[in-house]
UniProtKB/Swiss-Prot annotation:
PANTHER family in alphabetical order: DEHYDROGENASE_REDUCTASE FAMILY PROTEIN, PUTATIVE-RELATED, PHOSPHATIDYLINOSITOL-GLYCAN BIOSYNTHESIS CLASS F PROTEIN-RELATED
Assigned protein family: Belongs to the short-chain dehydrogenases/reductases (SDR) family.
Enzyme class, spelled out: oxidoreductase
Protein's name according to its UniProt entry: Short chain dehydrogenase virL
Keyword Oxidoreductase: yes
Function summary: Short chain dehydrogenase; part of the gene cluster that mediates the biosynthesis of virensols and trichoxide, fungal natural products that contain or are derived from a salicylaldehyde core. The pathway begins with the synthesis of the reduced chain in virensol C by the highly reducing polyketide synthase virA via condensation of one acetate and 8 malonate units. VirA has interesting programming rules since the first 2 ketides are fully reduced, the 3 following ketides undergo beta-dehydration, and the last 3 ketides are only reduced to beta-hydroxys to yield the trihydroxy portion.
EC number, as in UniProt: 1.1.1.-
Pfam families for the chain: adh_short
Length: 341
């Protein structure tokens, strides 16, 4: 449905568009939703938005929560809090380090052991300074975590969710990748290779690169959705908006943290409110959101560039480069098999 919203894309890229989104009133979930018997995976779930979304899923009766986290100790602390409040749910802590392809592959392989998977929220992400390269892959860390490893985990999980779909269920399992409306304000170079643009240290800017990584993410999801029948697995992007009360900016200098805190006090959503956008994406929006960008409890347009011939060419080059980067797991074959089967 995002593909049909070109007329709204220009507005979303304006300051007024940002303010309109931030002050949109949340829509409550429909009454009667129960997740009894269901299994959900939430990455980056030991703090902030991921933790809040996990709690809200459990409040709806979720039977089994898998918390995908980087630190076992921190994951165990968060899980203990949830187990106290939800003693009848099974809460598991599994390690996934989004800087490591091996860790991502191991996490996906472990998911095959589950009897069912109904909901996946890929929330793990970062914004980091200074410019940092992941030694094992040679990629800049923002690109690695927010885009490449997230794309890899999506590709690996799609056939697993499809295979484990319950024949007695009227709904499809869903993967929602957490995006950002900063993609509306950031563009990549339209000519030449896409991924190497993130290897240019001299042009590094943490906020710009974060927005660009989320732009690539949305381009990727809009493409991979073409290979997946939404009746098998639904895939979309969910944007929580500017959110306060998270650890997202941990590690920043004290002065910058104070400035960020002032901006968040004025504009940011409380974390529990922002996390409801995740639940809206996986429980409410349904088939019309397949391959789309969800934000503010509705479906929003892609960035303006997506609707242009140059943007479509960019999307195709990005797709080809991503498949080449991830073909060590047979990414192209996995995706093509999804379309054929």
């Amino acid at each position: 449905m995002s593909s049909q919203l070109e007329n709204e894309a220009s507005f979303e890229a304006t300051t007024l568009g940002f303010l309109w989104r931030q002050f949109t009133r949340p829509k409550p979930l429909p009454t009667g939703i129960t997740l009894a018997g269901q299994v959900a995976i939430v990455t980056g779930s030991n703090v902030g938005l991921g933790f809040s979304a996990s709690r809200q899923l459990l409040q709806l009766g979720l039977s089994h929560l898998i918390m995908g986290v980087r630190s076992q100790a921190k994951g165990d602390v968060a899980a203990a809090q949830l187990r106290t409040d939800f003693p009848f749910a099974t809460i598991s802590v599994w390690i996934v380090d989004m800087e490591s392809y091996d860790s991502v592959c191991a996490f996906a392989s472990r998911c095959e052991s589950l009897d069912r998977i109904d909901i996946v929220i890929l929330n793990a992400g970062l914004i980091k300074t200074p410019y940092t390269v992941v030694r094992a892959t040679g990629n800049e860390v923002t690109l690695q975590v927010n885009y490449l490893s997230t794309a890899l985990l999506t590709i690996l999980l799609l056939p697993i969710l499809k295979a484990k779909k319950r024949v007695d269920c009227s709904w499809s399992p869903v993967i929602s990748i957490v995006g950002s409306d900063l993609m509306y304000e950031n563009e990549v170079e339209l000519e030449g290779p896409v991924l190497p643009q993130f290897q240019q240290e001299e042009t590094f800017s943490q906020f710009s690169w974060y927005g660009k990584s989320k732009l690539l993410q949305t381009m990727f999801i809009s493409k991979i959705a073409e290979f997946v029948n939404p009746h098998d697995v639904l895939v979309n992007v969910s944007n929580p908006g500017m959110t306060g009360g998270t650890d997202f900016f941990r590690g920043y200098p004290a002065l910058m943290m104070k400035l960020i805190a002032v901006g968040q006090w004025i504009l940011a959503r409380p974390v529990d409110m922002a996390a409801t956008t995740y639940l809206d994406a996986v429980l409410v929006q349904g088939e019309k959101s397949h391959g789309s960008f969800t934000s503010d409890w509705t479906i929003k347009p892609y960035p303006k560039i997506w609707y242009t011939p140059e943007g479509q060419q960019l999307r195709e080059r990005l797709w080809e480069e991503t498949m080449e980067e991830l073909n060590f797991v047979g990414a192209s074959k996995i995706v093509n098999d999804l379309k054929r089967s």
